[in-house]
């Protein structure tokens, strides 16, 4: 027995020694095909949890046993297995995984770019992060062909986006957004709720083939957002933060006190001489203008004599400060991953009190429960707190009299000493509290079952809960309360919207020989409920409680209460087939059958099919020996897309419940029409879309060019039109009219220089689209947009054969000169006067009189082409990136500039009027000025004289960044460290004379200087 024990002991010791002998430390380096180190690659002993990740030089060290196999993986590269034969260093060269790198996420499914047959543009998170903005739309500007983005008009607003121009008349042109499979629109500040740092990639779906799976909701295009996930390897903690300082980018130049004083004096003098041609002008100037308060108040004389200038806009302005901070944590393994982020943004605008604070939180997690079962969630919550300032604050400040001393004691801003009860003092208006809060919860939760190879069953339940609350309080001690007789007013508006979406799909993928087939069927159900309540109270004895105590308003007869509710549903059945033969011939066929509650029974359902094909010519044998193209792919597609973008219950005539009576006589309910007549037979608006495209790559894929041409014909437009008063209704919605839209798109990406330490990349987009109205209701060839006095407006009119966005106005005949008067006196000006120095409209139809028939379409607000370009230089750790956007050929009205050039000195005036007509300056650009007398003449705003050219080239962002070298980062025990400085909206080359041709005249455009930090460990 002892002998046996001894033998066993010897064997155990031998085995232990042998095991110890096999336990070795292996070192190695992981690089790419250019010998650049791959940072953060996962190195794991196959079949175990023993592993590590590579450092900043691509190196790793791991204790293993001889004969074990290392599994090396990194996202975007082909994984490799390396068997350990000894303790000699291991060098692993990883090749790019083109299958993964070329994938885009479309409709919750990953597809290789080379397999796409539709028009899809992809933008990575790296590109999005090149501009320090908090809105994804702003980050996309100039990056995607066919996508036109306008900057937000206020810091609390979203940037607007259009994909492939105008495809409808009355309806919205906004696309839908799909965030991790959840379909949403931009209401309730939706897109502004997305944290840009959480975005992994964005795909923009532009044609019917690409948007087909979204049916009617994708008629204006689809923006698909995929958020970040955790990655395999060691956990990662990162921080991204920046702070920016904002100033006015552009303020149109206005006259100072002396210039404005002389302008008004000249206007009064011209008015006097026009009505008193034989009068004593010197006596009038000395005795009336300068010797009385006919033209000037005493405080205006004082400002003129002492050369005082008061800048009211500056008094309500400040240097804006915006800062953004995001912390994220992520990790993953073979069984699951998670990504968690927290964000905070504070944007103090350039107008006093204007501010937006935003809080975001996100958790993305997935877990492989079984080899055939995976579950996951993508959930985010956003709270946005806006402190709003009434538009009138800036407008009244910029319109204020520069001869009026700045004070918060005066109630209204006056010109010539004349009391203006509606021109409230903007400094006092800043006392109004106006708070707007959005809360939004987005949660997409899925279960994925793979019972057999190739078969995939996925069920996703998503919820989008949005809450909006706006509270406003107007104090009882400012003139607004006195003017409107409220003695203080409090308002409480609350909106809630709940959307749930349930998607189920069954897909099967099979390959046999050179054939690859992917088929999918599915259903989608969506229900949206909306609730609104408003309460108003007036009469407050104290301002202490603001809008927090509506019940204390003592004016009981001025209390208000209103509510609204609506519900809509959409049920869809979906089928899609993708076919691929040898990577050469690709075919995609899709059909979606949508049923909407917005239409009456019998018209609720619509079927929307699409088909597209592609030919990878470079995969053909006859192309193997050519050296020009690395890729040459032709694409063609056709599809029908629906649109249901109308109000709920438009097929019914709706009535509001009201009441009549008094507390003495009693109250009775009555039903009052809302003015719109229902149309029971309205149905889907339908678009037919055609797309042709070609994708090319040259010089070892370093230059890529995509070109697309499209045609969209939209008929049975859901249009609202007016009705005769004899019908008892004011309007109705019908399937009437048609519009056509066509265009070209170009997208270029080039790696111009690629050396060891230096790289230069360039990207550009160019888009052209043109729409025209091809049919209106009835036999009409024009539908005018008229105001309450039946005056035809300059914009909003519809003409057959013209764009939806025309400008309809008189053409300018010029400034009348003495030599023209014989000819001009023969024209009937319909109550207006034309004399030397006056502007006059052109008699377009040459009938000797000026009327509405002389107005013409002089252009549209649509650009002839638009796009953007960027250039990126990098040398070692230093990089310089510039992003430009441009637009050409659009025309635009600027109400602000029209006000400035229409001034007679009794209002703020443009310095352009320094070059005005006088008998000594007959070649002036601007007409003479007249005031103080009854003289009816044409103003600049009534003619195309005031229409602006809206072409521009804007430097959207210029960024200088430095990424610290590996030695420094390792010494600090970090994974990444980058600092940068960015200038946004540094310049804009344009002939536009308003504030900004993108943001408009309502809020001044800003320029921002930003300093940022990115670090990870």
Question: Where are these predicted regions, by residue range?
Answer:
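Short, acidic, small-residue-rich periplasmic hinge/interaction motif at the N-terminus
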Residues: 29-47, 69-78, 85-129, 137, ...
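Short, polar/charged loop or turn motifs at beta-strand boundaries
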Residues: 29-33, 119-142, 150-152, 160-168, ...
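Short, acidic Ser/Thr/Gly-rich low-complexity loop/linker segments typical of extracellular
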Residues: 49-59
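Short acidic/polar hinge/loop motifs at secondary-structure boundaries
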Residues: 60-63, 138, 175, 180-208
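Residues embedded in well-ordered regular secondary structure
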Residues: 122, 131-133, 143-146, 150-160, ...
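Extracellular/periplasmic, surface-exposed regions of secreted and cell-surface proteins
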Residues: 128-133, 166, 173-174, 323, ...
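Conserved small-residue
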Residues: 238-303, 534-536, 734, 751-860, ...
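Extracytoplasmic gating/loop element in the C-terminal half of outer-membrane beta-barrel translocons
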Residues: 596, 834, 887-979
């Amino acid at each position: 027995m002892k002998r046996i024990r001894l033998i066993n002991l010897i064997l155990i010791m031998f085995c232990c020694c042998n095991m110890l002998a096999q336990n070795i430390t292996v070192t190695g380096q992981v690089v790419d095909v250019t010998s650049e180190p791959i940072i953060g690659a996962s190195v794991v002993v196959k079949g175990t949890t023993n592993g590590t990740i590579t450092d900043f030089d691509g190196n790793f060290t791991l204790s293993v046993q001889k004969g074990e196999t290392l599994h090396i993986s990194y996202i975007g590269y082909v994984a490799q297995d390396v068997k350990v034969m000894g303790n000699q260093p291991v060098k692993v060269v990883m090749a790019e995984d083109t299958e993964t790198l070329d994938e885009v996420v479309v409709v919750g499914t990953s597809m290789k770019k080379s397999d796409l047959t539709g028009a899809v543009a992809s933008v990575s998170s790296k590109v999005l992060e090149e501009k320090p903005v908090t809105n994804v739309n702003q980050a996309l500007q100039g990056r995607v062909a066919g996508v036109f983005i306008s900057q937000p008009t206020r810091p609390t607003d979203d940037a607007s986006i259009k994909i492939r121009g105008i495809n409808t008349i009355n309806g919205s042109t906004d696309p839908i957004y799909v965030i991790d499979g959840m379909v949403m629109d931009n209401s309730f500040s939706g897109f502004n709720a997305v944290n840009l740092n959480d975005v992994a990639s964005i795909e923009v779906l532009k044609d019917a083939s690409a948007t087909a799976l979204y049916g009617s909701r994708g008629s204006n295009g689809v923006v698909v957002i995929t958020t970040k996930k955790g990655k395999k390897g060691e956990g990662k903690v990162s921080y991204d933060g920046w702070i920016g300082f904002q100033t006015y980018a552009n303020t149109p130049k206005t006259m100072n006190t002396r210039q404005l004083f002389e302008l008004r004096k000249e206007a009064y003098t011209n008015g006097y001489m026009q009505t008193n041609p034989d009068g004593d002008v010197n006596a009038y100037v000395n005795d009336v203008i300068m010797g009385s308060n006919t033209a000037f108040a005493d405080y205006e004389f004082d400002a003129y004599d002492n050369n005082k200038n008061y800048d009211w806009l500056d008094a309500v302005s400040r240097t804006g400060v915006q800062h953004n901070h995001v912390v994220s944590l992520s990790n993953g393994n073979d069984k699951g991953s998670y990504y968690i982020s927290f964000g905070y943004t504070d944007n103090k605008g350039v107008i006093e009190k204007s501010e937006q604070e935003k809080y975001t939180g996100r958790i993305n997690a997935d877990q492989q429960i079984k080899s055939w079962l995976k579950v996951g969630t993508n959930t985010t919550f956003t709270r946005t707190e806006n402190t709003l300032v009434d538009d009138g604050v800036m407008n009244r400040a910029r319109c204020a009299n520069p001869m009026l001393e700045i004070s918060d004691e005066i109630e209204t801003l006056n010109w010539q000493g004349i009391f203006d009860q509606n021109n409230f003092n903007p400094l006092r208006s800043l006392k109004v509290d106006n708070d707007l809060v959005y809360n939004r919860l987005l949660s997409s939760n899925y279960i994925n079952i793979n019972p057999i190879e190739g078969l995939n069953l996925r069920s996703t339940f998503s919820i989008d809960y949005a809450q909006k609350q706006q509270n406003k309080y107007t104090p009882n001690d400012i003139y607004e309360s006195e003017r409107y007789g409220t003695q203080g007013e409090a308002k409480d508006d609350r909106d809630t919207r709940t959307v749930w979406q349930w998607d189920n799909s069954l897909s099967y993928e099979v390959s046999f020989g050179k054939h690859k087939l992917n088929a999918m069927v599915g259903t989608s159900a969506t229900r949206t409920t909306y609730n609104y309540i408003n309460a108003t109270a007036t009469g407050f004895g104290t301002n202490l409680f603001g809008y927090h105590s509506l019940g204390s308003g003592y004016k009981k007869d001025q209390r208000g209460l209103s509510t609204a509710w609506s519900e809509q549903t959409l049920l869809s059945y979906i089928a899609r087939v993708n076919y691929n033969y040898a990577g050469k011939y690709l075919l995609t066929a899709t059909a979606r059958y949508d049923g909407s509650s917005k239409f009456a029974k019998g018209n609720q359902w619509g079927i929307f099919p699409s088909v597209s094909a592609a030919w990878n010519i470079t995969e053909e044998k006859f192309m193997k020996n050519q050296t020009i193209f690395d890729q040459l792919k032709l694409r063609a597609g056709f599809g029908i897309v629906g649109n249901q973008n109308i109000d709920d219950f438009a097929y019914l005539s709706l009535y509001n419940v009201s009441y009549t009576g008094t507390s003495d006589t009693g109250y009775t309910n009555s039903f009052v029409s809302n003015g719109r007549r229902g149309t029971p037979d309205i149905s889907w608006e339908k678009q037919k879309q055609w797309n042709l495209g070609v994708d090319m790559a040259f010089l070892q894929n370093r230059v890529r060019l995509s070109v697309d041409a499209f045609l969209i014909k939209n008929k049975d437009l859901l249009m609202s039109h007016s009705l005769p008063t004899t019908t008892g209704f004011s309007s109705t919605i019908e399937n009437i009219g048609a519009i056509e839209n066509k265009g070209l798109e170009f997208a270029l990406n080039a790696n111009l220089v690629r050396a060891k330490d230096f790289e230069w990349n360039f990207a550009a987009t160019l888009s052209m689209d043109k729409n025209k109205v091809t049919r209106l209701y009835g036999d009409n060839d024009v539908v005018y947009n008229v105001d309450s006095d039946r005056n035809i407006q300059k914009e909003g009119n519809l003409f057959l054969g013209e764009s939806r966005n025309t400008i309809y106005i008189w053409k300018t005949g010029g400034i009348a000169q003495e030599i023209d008067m014989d000819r001009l006196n023969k024209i009937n000006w319909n109550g207006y006067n034309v004399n030397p120095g006056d502007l006059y409209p052109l008699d377009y139809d040459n009938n000797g009189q000026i009327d509405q028939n002389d107005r013409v379409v002089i252009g549209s607000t649509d650009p002839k082409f638009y796009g953007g370009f960027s250039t990126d230089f990098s040398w070692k750790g230093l990089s310089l990136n510039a992003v430009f956007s441009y637009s050409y050929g659009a025309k635009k009205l600027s109400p602000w500039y029209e006000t400035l050039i229409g001034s007679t000195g009794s209002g703020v005036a443009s310095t352009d009027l320094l070059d005005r007509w006088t008998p000594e300056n007959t070649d002036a650009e601007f007409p003479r000025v007249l005031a103080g007398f009854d003289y009816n003449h044409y103003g600049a705003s009534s003619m195309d004289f005031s229409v602006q050219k809206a072409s521009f080239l804007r430097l959207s962002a210029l960024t200088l960044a430095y990424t610290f070298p590996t030695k420094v980062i390792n010494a600090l025990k970090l994974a990444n460290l980058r600092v940068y400085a960015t200038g946004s909206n540094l310049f804009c080359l344009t002939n536009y004379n308003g504030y900004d041709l993108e943001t408009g005249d309502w809020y001044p455009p800003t320029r921002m200087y930003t300093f940022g930090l990115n670090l990870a460990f």
